[in-house]
From Swiss-Prot:
It comes from Ambrosia artemisiifolia (Common ragweed). This is Profilin-1. Belongs to the profilin family. GO terms for cellular component: cell cortex; cytoskeleton. Keywords: Actin-binding, Allergen, Cytoplasm, Cytoskeleton. The lineage of its organism: Eukaryota, Viridiplantae, Streptophyta, Embryophyta, Tracheophyta. SUPFAM superfamilies: Profilin (actin-binding protein). The keyword Cytoplasm applies.
Length: 131
C-alpha cells in the first residue's frame, strides 16, 4: 500500500459520520511522505519544534504548537509518543512512529477522541511494523 493510500484510506476515512479536516504522514526530517489535499504547507521549523517536544516533552507548551502557520494550544498528550493541540472548536493529534509523524487535524463536529483514534491506531500499527 502506498503512503498516499494510507492517508486516503486510514486517516481521511469516515468515523461516525465525520472526517478529519486534513491529514499527513511526514518523516522526522520534515519530508512529506503523503498528505490530504487540504493539509497545510508546514515549515521546517514547525517540524523541528514538534520533534523537540517529543524529545523534551513540554517544550512546546509555553509557545504553542504551530502547524502550517496555525497556532494550537498544547494539551495533555503522551510524553514522547503523542502531542495534542487545541484551537477553538478543533485541534490536532500528532503520533510519533519510528520514522514518521502521523498528523490529523479536525474541526467540529468531529470530537478529539475520534481524531485520536484515527491518528493513533494506524500510528501504533506503523510502530509495530518498524516504520
Amino acid at each position: 500500500m502506498s503512503w498516499q493510500a494510507y492517508v486516503d484510506d486510514h486517516l481521511m476515512c469516515e468515523i461516525e459520520g465525520n472526517h478529519l479536516s486534513a491529514a499527513a504522514i511526514i518523516g522526522h526530517d520534515g519530508v512529506v511522505w503523503a498528505q490530504s489535499a487540504t493539509f497545510p504547507q508546514v515549515k521546517p521549523e514547525e517540524i523541528t519544534g514538534i520533534m523537540n517536544d517529543f524529545n523534551e516533552p513540554g517544550s512546546l507548551a509555553p509557545t504553542g504548537l504551530y502547524l502550517g502557520g496555525t497556532k494550537y494550544m498544547v494539551i495533555q498528550g503522551e510524553p514522547g509518543a503523542v502531542i495534542r493541540g487545541k484551537k477553538g472548536p478543533g485541534g490536532v493529534t500528532i503520533k510519533k512512529t519510528t520514522m514518521s509523524l502521523i498528523i490529523g487535524i479536525y474541526d467540529e463536529p468531529m470530537t478529539p477522541g475520534q481524531c485520536n483514534m484515527l491518528v493513533e491506531r494506524p500510528g501504533d500499527y506503523l510502530l509495530e511494523q518498524g516504520f
